[in-house]
Amino acid sequence: MNIRKIESDKKQFLDLLLLADEQESMIDRYIDRGEMFVLDDNGTKAVAVVTDEGNGCCELKNIAVAPECHRQGYGKALLSFLLSYYKGKFRQIIVGTGETPQHRAFYEHCGFTFSHRIEGFFTRHYD
């Protein structure tokens, strides 16, 4: 298993990114300003994008695992790497996600705590 930072041609991972953020125009808002990491294990298994939101805060904008690789530990491994990588660089890492129970359970299992809900976020920002 290898995790590497992607410096260029980030759109080559668009199909994987679209699994976690279904609207390309939304991905376009953060893909270039964010840092992208890919987890490889005999092929690309997962991808993540993290942005600097200022004031010592970064946001995990997207983390996606190839469907055939779900529940094999790739998402947790990539998230664990990111938490270590950004520790000391930021005082807070936030995640905005949909309200599906499995997504929330994943983040809580990885040490995140629920903060708040933004009412109508998806209806206001997505087509």
Language-model segment annotations:
Residues 4-62, 66:
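Acetyl-CoA-dependent GNAT
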Residues 59, 89-91, 111:
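Short loop/turn motifs at secondary-structure junctions
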Residues 63-71, 98:
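A short, internal acetyl-CoA/4′-phosphopantetheine-binding micro-motif in the GNAT/acyltransferase core
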Residues 65, 79, 100-103, 120-126:
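Short glycine/proline-centered loop/turn elements that form peptide/ligand docking sites
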Residues 69, 73-81:
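Conserved acetyl-CoA pyrophosphate-binding loop and the N-cap/start of the following alpha-helix
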Residues 85, 106:
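Short alpha-helical functional segments enriched in proximate histidine and acidic residues
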Residues 86-99:
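Conserved GNAT acetyl-CoA-binding A-motif
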Residues 94-96, 108, 113-127:
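Conserved catalytic-core motifs of GNAT/GCN5-like acyltransferases
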